[in-house]
Structure formats: structure tokens, C-alpha cells
Amino acid sequence: MNAALNLWKDAHAKRLSQYCAVRVIGRVSAVRRILLECRIPSAKVGDLCEVSKADGSLLLAEIVGFTQECTLLSALGPPDGIQVGAPIRPLGVAHRIGVDDSLLGCVLDGFGRPLMGDCLGAFAGPEDRRTTLPVIADALPPTQRPRITRALPTGIRAIDSAILLGEGQRVGLFAGAGCGKTTLMAELARNMDCDVIVFGLIGERGRELREFLDHELDETLRRRSVLVCATSDRSSMERARAAFTATAIAEAFRARGQKVLLLLDSLTRFARAQREIGIASGEPLGRGGLPPSVYTLLPRLVERAGMSENGSITALYTVLIEQDSMNDPVADEVRSLLDGHIVLSRKLAERGHYPAIDVSASISRILSNVTGRKHQRANNRLRQLLAAYKQVEMLLRLGEYQAGADPVTDCAVQLNEAINAFLRQDLREPVPLQETLDRLLQLTSQLPE
């Protein structure tokens, strides 16, 4: 009885400590693009506020900074209808979400609010009674991250043979527009062994979102998935926040001991949204025309995925590259942060070679942790054959290649069609890992020692 009474007292003491008898209200003094200037006493960076529009509707905004004279708020939606003198009510809480099994099958906006159906959503207001967690949070300490040791087959021969992934790995999918990255991402979601799938679709066209829901996700997959969507017409704040919302949802399921697959499309559009926010906030432009906040937030985002003592988040981040160049500043930065990368080739896509994975340019930094010596040796031989063929490809097209000079190159030319047939694969036809390994060993055994 005493224990129950103490719990009741503690709960009500916590609620009373958050209660303020004086209603604090600020006023908008200036509107600069997505930034609002006002004065709010005792405000903290990260706190949410409600801004009243001229028509009586409310706009959420977040405190992002201060000057000597005013508080700076970033509007979480279009600031249309905001006028000077509009009242601002600080909510006294940061952006938080509540996560439970009721979220499975839901489609949410960038802040965690429901977009369709009767889903409650994840967004937690100040009166929310659920157990909540912050959307913007720190990653787990390195000492609390177990080593990646378990393979996570994808059912795709081109990946499982040369870039076999591990549970808890963070991988980048680098591709130009039209190379099939979204289709490949959906195929990975269908094939990979996981308990929960969290999709983060950032800056996508609205039409593509509906097509993705209807054609790529069947009912079984939908029942164990959560989709966080911020289409290209949404505010830059929502597009940038969607990546953190999806990651926070994945973290909540991982804390419950589940294996989570996080698919974020794309980090490039996240960086572009953050660039808009940085420029509006007055940040100077740095390398690649990006403000410093982009390079600060990218590692804060991707480091939150990975293994924990309870569960795991295996993360796949797509990155758009222009003209198939890996020297794009976002691509270059992301490649240095992740545990591996898969590169899609436009040349292969134009030939009808799908999935258009350039095995030679793709790599997994934890491959040795999840494969045996035979697999590693066969993988090295496959790459050797692909590299040897690439060196003489132009000579073959011109009819100038002379066989007999190098036995490795001769073998690469003879096996080229067989290798391409091995790396091609139709959709919705997953191949068991052992079958992939057997075919890989058979192919590469013909390479002379």
C-alpha cells in the first residue's frame, strides 16, 4: 500500500513541477523566411512553441538560438499567415515521440504526426501520457556497442557475394537519378531478416510516395513497418527533422530488443534541407557550398544506428550523386562515416543490368567479421576478374585484344558473360546465401593461381 502511495505521490509531484500558474507568452517581432524573432523569458534551445496565425490556426516552431535582443525560432511549417505581434506560447518541452506497437503500419509526417488512417502517431505533446523519448539525442557511447559478427543476407547475389552485410551495419547506397535505388531499397526490405522496418522518405515526390505504398509494400510488410514521409513540398525544417524522427523510432524499437532495419532515402535531400535552414540562420557557407551545421548533423544522425546490448539497427542510407561522381561533398562526407557503400552504375542500368550494382566500386568494411576465409578468397578473385576485364574492355570493343599475353585477363574475358549472369537478378526472387556462395566458388575456381 505504501509503495503504491509513494508512486502516486512521485507521479503527481512530477506533474506539479511542470505546472506553471503564470502563462508565459511572447510576441513575434520579425519574420525572416523560416526564422521568427521574438522575446520569450527563460526559453531553452530545442523547446517547442505554438505561434498563432491570423486565421486562428497554430504553427509549431522550435527555438534554435538567441541574440542579445531576441529569441530565434524556426517554423516547423510554412510561416504564411504569421504577422508581427502574433502571440507565441512556449510549450516548455523539446520535440519528443511516443513509440509502441500501435505505430506499426502507420504513415507519419516528418514530426511523427499521422498522415493517413486512424493511427495516433508518434508526436508527443506536453500533455502526452506515454513514455516518450527525444527526437534529437546523442548516440550510444562506443563502449556500449557490441562488435558486428552476424551476417545479414539480402537474398541479392551481387551483394551477398561481394559486399555481405552484417546485423547492425550502416551502409550507403550511392546512385544517380534513375538507377533503381528506390526499387533496390524495397527489395532489401522484403528480403532481409528483421522484426521492424522504419522507412524515412525525405524530399520524395508525392506521387512516388503513393506508388511506393501500393506497389512495393505488401500487406505483410506494411504490418511490421513504420513510414516517416516529408515530401519535397514540405518545409525545410520538416524535411530535415524527418531523418531524426525515423531514427528515433528505430532506436525505440531497438531498446525493446528488436532487430530493426532503417531505410533512409535520402541523406542528400536531408543535407539540402539543412542547408536551407543554415543559410536562413545566417551560417557562412563552407566546403561544397554547405554550411557547417550539415557536417555537424550528418555524423550525429548516422552514429545513432548500429548495435546495442539489447537489439540492433541495420541502416541503409541512399545518397544521390551527380553525373556518377563520388566527389560530391555530401557523398564524400557520408562515405567516410559509414561502414560500407554500395554503388549503382548508370552504365549498367542503361544496359538493362539490374540490380545495377558496380561490385568493383562497392565495399563493406566489416566483411571479414561476417565471412569465412573461403568466401573472402572467392570475393577477392571475383574482384580480380572484374578489374582485369575492365582494363581490356575498350580493346575488346575495338577488336584489338590479343589473347595469350595474360592468363588472368584471358580467364576474365572468357568468364565475363557468366559473371554478369551471376550478378543479374530479377525482382522478388531472393537467393539463399549458401546457393550464392556455391555459385561464387564455382565461378572463381576457374581463375588460375
Swiss-Prot record:
For this protein, the record's Pfam families field holds: ATP-synt_ab, ATP-synt_ab_N, T3SS_ATPase_C
Which EC class heads this enzyme's classification? translocase
The highest taxon in the source lineage is Bacteria
Write down the Gene3D superfamilies for this protein, in alphabetical order. Answer: 3.40.50.12240
Q: Relate the protein's function as given in its record.
A: ATPase component of the type III secretion system (T3SS), also called injectisome, which is used to inject bacterial effector proteins into eukaryotic host cells. Acts as a molecular motor to provide the energy that is required for the export of proteins. Required for type III secretion apparatus (T3SA) formation, proper protein secretion, host cell invasion and virulence. May play a critical role in T3SS substrate recognition, disassembly of the effector/chaperone complex and unfolding of the effector in an ATP-dependent manner prior to secretion.
Subunit record text: The core secretion machinery of the T3SS is composed of approximately 20 different proteins, including cytoplasmic components, a base, an export apparatus and a needle. This subunit is part of the cytosolic complex. Forms homododecamers.
- Supply the name of the protein: Type 3 secretion system ATPase
Lineage start: Bacteria, Pseudomonadati, Pseudomonadota, Gammaproteobacteria, Pseudomonadales
